[in-house]
Amino acid sequence: MTSLSVFRDVPTAQKLEGSLLKIYRQDGYPSKLFLAYKVCMTEEGHPWVSLVVHKTRLQIAEDPSLDYEYLPLVGLKSFIQSSLELLFGKHSEAIAEKRVGGVHIVGESGAFQLGAQFLKTWRKNVKIVCIVSCQKEQCGLIFQDMGFIVYEYSIWNASDLCSDPSMFVEVLQHIPVGSILVIGNITDCKFTQNQWTKLMSIIKSKQIFPFFDIPCQGLSTGDLEEDTKILQYFVSLGLEFFCSQSLSKNFGIYDEGVGILVVAALSNQHLLCVLSQLMDYVQALWGNPPATGARIITSILCNPALFGEWKQSLKGVVENMMLIKEKVKEKLRLLGTPGSWDHITRQSGTHGYLGLTYQQVEFLVKKKHIYLPKTSRINFTCINARNIDYITQSIHEAVMLTEG
């Protein structure tokens, strides 16, 4: 006799935007393309890995002095220290004053999971979390599961085809006092110092708690310090915040899920209290973070020669990416595609907006088998010499068919 399953009332989970990749994989068209990978891609269409990572991984594997014991709850301390110095600079006053610290976490989502758990417990009167559109899928569910009400916002001006600080100001002016604001990819927002100063003034006056996300330091401008100077400015003025610092993409260690949850506090005393609470949550969530990726990164960051090699590899990725953007813009110009495409090269970072309408995106997906999100925000490293002509010709056709 068949017994009833204890899982009989469990439904299939609601489909996420991530199903775009599933649809792509089910497409039998031989020349299909996917332009929404999260990782950096090589010219050959494979995930990019810094060459210095390969070398360092082998050295660590052959080191007989290393043990494989559990790490402390806080994680690998040398990794945390070197990561903080990478983020804020070796001579940071905040580091010297010991008012910034971190917890070694499991992947970028681990930072949001840990941070959300803390905020749920210690900011019980706060229910609103505002998340930038391109990150809602990634961390929105985490906050929802914690009982927060999640609002989505965008700072991309679809009319002017640029990041618009006035849209950011409007978001800040309308969200409730004390809300949590997830600020993603600040390295890709080309705001001026004065614009950031105005934004920070509103954040402080409304007691908004910022939760920054730094997923790929160095892959925006090719300059590690330039990519985080706004974060350094914020911490220099005593702003308290959390920050998810992921080091998976800029080292090419995607399967390791390497990063830290950074805490910036007013004083060392406040910092230590927060870290102690976070470590309690760590014990319940994962107990022990992965060590191999952290050891690879620490070895590179603490060795001047290896660090120099790694920086050069980042510059190589950024230079290649900038060249791809220039080629896409030029090919669209030569095809006579209506509209200006200057916004493609004005954007920094691996990901950027093509500035297409939903109708044009739908044409690319259904008629050309080119898969990209409805927002037309793509990973430019997915474009290479083998597919650029097909992609630009398809964009041209999409625009021409929907023009007017």
Curated annotation (Swiss-Prot):
Q: Which cofactor does it need?
A: pyridoxal 5'-phosphate
Q: How does it assemble?
A: Homodimer.
**Per its record, what are the GO molecular function terms?**
L-aspartate:2-oxoglutarate aminotransferase activity; pyridoxal phosphate binding
What does the record give as the organism's lineage? Answer: Eukaryota, Metazoa, Chordata, Craniata, Vertebrata
- Sequence positions bearing N6-(pyridoxal phosphate)lysine: K249
Where does the protein end up? Cytoplasm
Q: Give the UniProt entry's GO cellular component terms.
A: cytoplasm
**What family does this belong to?**
Belongs to the class-I pyridoxal-phosphate-dependent aminotransferase family.
UniProt cross-references to SUPFAM superfamilies, sorted A to Z:
PLP-dependent transferases (SSF53383)
Q: Which EC class heads this enzyme's classification? A: transferase
Q: What is its EC number?
A: 2.6.1.1
Protein name in the entry: Putative aspartate aminotransferase, cytoplasmic 2
Q: Which UniProt keywords apply?
A: Aminotransferase, Cytoplasm, Pyridoxal phosphate, Transferase
- PANTHER family named among the record's database cross-references: ASPARTATE AMINOTRANSFERASE, ASPARTATE AMINOTRANSFERASE, CYTOPLASMIC 2-RELATED
As recorded in Swiss-Prot or TrEMBL, the protein's gene is named: Got1l1
A GO BP annotation:
amino acid metabolic process
The catalytic activity, as recorded, is: L-aspartate + 2-oxoglutarate = oxaloacetate + L-glutamate
Q: Which Pfam families match?
A: Aminotran_1_2
Instruction: State the Gene3D superfamilies in the record.
Output: Aspartate Aminotransferase, domain 1, Type I PLP-dependent aspartate aminotransferase-like (Major domain)
**What's the further remark here?**
In eukaryotes there are cytoplasmic, mitochondrial and chloroplastic isozymes.
- The region annotated as signal peptide is none
